[in-house]
């Protein structure tokens, strides 16, 4: 399986009302219309190409990162790009809101998946354009049985908040080691062992929470997850216990998680997931949920203060489970900045 990095470059964030994306697209239409005949795309006889729009819609609820799903929690909201859609992102919004009754707010493009053999049949090539959306969870509704699920249901090895999950030592590493030992030559064996060490933080290498897609693709290549065995039923059940998804939707979800884990380190998108007012502990727990790692409390608060990301509201939380804490809000002027240069969240293993 090729990495998602082989797809299109990520696009800039899209405005909630879609104006900027539509304006850019409208400006490009006359240029396409005037293109010489020899530059117009050709279609191959007997073969079709279609565009599919897929949403990775994320919320953080009760300290858990959750993703909006369909079809008994085995699919992401998606639908074909149709002629009636005035732009890609307007088509995405139409499908998500039709299928889930959940409005979209912050949206940015992830990648374009166009690999062959994506499980979509050989008579048509489907280009899937994926988007990452951040929201606050609302009760799911609709005709497609939409539901919110923890993304650790699909990637249980990614949650390191309480230490290294047992599934890594008990299931993943023994099977991955066997995969490496089965290599036909010494060079490939060593290459596989190196990949395992880098992706899972072995042999003195640190755990990198951003390598979500690389870990998933390694498990796929080793044939350890259900998606890798669909065309080979004779292999029996996959040895790694985790929830699979239709087609390559779990690969797309892995791409979205990796993007968000990287983005929270340099851009204040985490505030899209929080209520209007929050405590610093709520902010910290939200970051930890997304990263799958704990952060150092004092360093985290010092960083937030240094970056001037929040301001006090003058009110206290009404949570009766402990001592009242100060309520903060996100400084809205930060929204006009493209990035917080140099911001790195202090993530620790403890």
Which functions belong to the PLM regions below?
Residues 63-104, 110-116, 264-288:
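Conserved Nudix-box catalytic region and its N-terminal flanking loop in Nudix hydrolases
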Residues 3-11:
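Intrinsically disordered, low-complexity segments enriched in serine/proline and basic residues
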Residues 294-313:
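Charge-enriched amphipathic alpha-helical scaffolds
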Residues 130-134, 141-264, 277-281, 300, ...:
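NUDIX/MutT-family hydrolases
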Residues 133, 308-350:
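Long, intrinsically disordered, low-complexity Ser/Thr/Pro-rich regulatory/activation regions
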Residues 117-142, 257, 326-334:
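Active-site-adjacent beta-strand/loop module that shapes the phosphate/pyrophosphate-binding cleft
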Residues 36-75:
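N-terminal strand-loop-strand
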């Amino acid at each position: 399986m090729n990495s998602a990095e082989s797809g299109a470059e990520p696009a800039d964030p899209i405005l909630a009302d879609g104006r900027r994306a539509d304006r850019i697209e409208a400006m490009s239409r006359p240029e396409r219309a005037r293109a010489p005949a020899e530059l117009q795309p050709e279609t191959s006889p007997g073969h079709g190409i279609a565009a599919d729009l897929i949403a990775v819609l994320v919320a953080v609820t009760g300290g858990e990162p959750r993703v909006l799903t369909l079809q008994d929690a085995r699919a992401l909201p998606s639908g074909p790009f149709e002629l009636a859609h005035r732009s890609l992102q307007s088509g995405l919004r139409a499908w998500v809101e039709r299928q889930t009754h959940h409005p979209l707010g912050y949206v940015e493009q992830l990648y374009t998946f166009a690999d062959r053999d994506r499980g979509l049949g050989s008579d048509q090539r489907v280009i899937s354009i994926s988007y990452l959306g951040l929201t606050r969870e609302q009760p799911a509704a609709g005709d497609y049985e939409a539901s919110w699920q923890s993304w650790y249901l699909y990637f249980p090895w990614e949650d390191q908040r309480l230490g290294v999950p047992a599934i890594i030592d008990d299931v993943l590493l023994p099977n991955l080691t066997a995969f490496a030992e089965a290599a036909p030559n010494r060079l490939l064996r060593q290459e596989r062992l190196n990949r395992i060490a880098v992706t899972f933080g072995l042999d003195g290498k640190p755990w990198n929470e951003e390598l979500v897609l690389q870990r998933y693709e390694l498990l796929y290549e080793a044939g350890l997850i259900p998606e890798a065995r669909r065309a080979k039923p004779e292999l029996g059940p996959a040895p790694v216990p985790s929830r699979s998804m239709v087609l390559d939707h779990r690969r797309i979800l892995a791409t979205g998680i990796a993007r968000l884990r990287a983005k929270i380190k340099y851009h204040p998108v985490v505030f899209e997931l929080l209520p209007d007012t929050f405590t610093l502990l709520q902010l910290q727990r939200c970051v930890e949920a997304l990263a799958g790692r704990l952060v150092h409390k004092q360093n985290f608060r010092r960083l937030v203060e240094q970056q001037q990301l929040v301001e006090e509201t003058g009110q206290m939380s009404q949570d009766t489970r402990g001592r009242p804490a100060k309520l903060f809000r996100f400084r809205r002027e930060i929204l006009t900045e493209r990035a917080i240069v140099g911001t790195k969240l202090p993530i620790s293993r403890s």
